[in-house]
Design a protein with these regions (language model features):
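D/E-rich low-complexity acidic segments and tails
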Residues: 10-34
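Glycine-rich phosphate-binding loop at the start of an alpha helix
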Residues: 65, 93, 150
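The conserved Walker
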Residues: 85-89
Length: 168
């Protein structure tokens, strides 16, 4: 017998706005990305701080991917997004850049939590966030099982603005 999951009625679900499709465009919107992998927009065209732009440039990136071009401005404005895209299209940076940009520096109070499905992905997301935080006074901590909890617990006690973790 096949088991199915019971879905919540739409009125109970949290409101979430989807990012515009890569092909969508309007008169007010910037040029639409050509694909999830490609965009004509440079990171310098987005409302990003000099610290973030410097970190992005040091990693050799100048042009946003299609996913990033479609999501950066709504995410920077604080809108909730649901983004689905293929592997390698820049989704991690698409949510890490606005997350790091919107967090105040140096207060050591957790401001953002990113959940990943695996330990390896949690480590990768934390590493990308740390790279973006290079010129901002923001600490990132990865929390996951399979290793001693002592150093992770100490990092939380010391304070960090971004926690990246995985269940289990």
């Amino acid at each position: 017998k096949k088991r199915t999951r019971k879905k919540k009625p739409a009125e109970e679900a949290a409101p979430v706005e989807e990012a515009p499709a890569a092909e969508a465009s309007s008169e007010e919107a910037p040029a639409a990305p050509r694909s999830d992998y490609d965009s004509a927009r440079k990171f310098s065209e987005f409302p990003l701080s000099p610290e973030i732009l410097k970190s992005i440039a040091e990693h050799g990136y100048e042009t946003a991917t299609g996913v990033q071009a479609a999501t950066l401005e709504p995410a920077l404005a604080g809108r909730d997004l649901v983004v689905r895209s293929k592997t390698g299209t820049g989704k991690t940076a698409a949510f890490c850049i606005p997350m790091v940009e919107r967090i105040g520096s140096g207060d050591r109070v957790t401001r953002a939590i990113a959940l990943a499905p695996t330990r390896e992905l949690a480590r990768q997301v934390a590493a990308e966030c740390e790279a973006l935080c290079k010129y901002k006074d923001i600490r990132v901590t990865a929390i996951y099982g399979g290793v001693g909890f002592g150093s992770q617990e100490q990092a939380l006690k010391d304070g960090c603005e971004i926690v990246v973790g995985t269940p289990g």
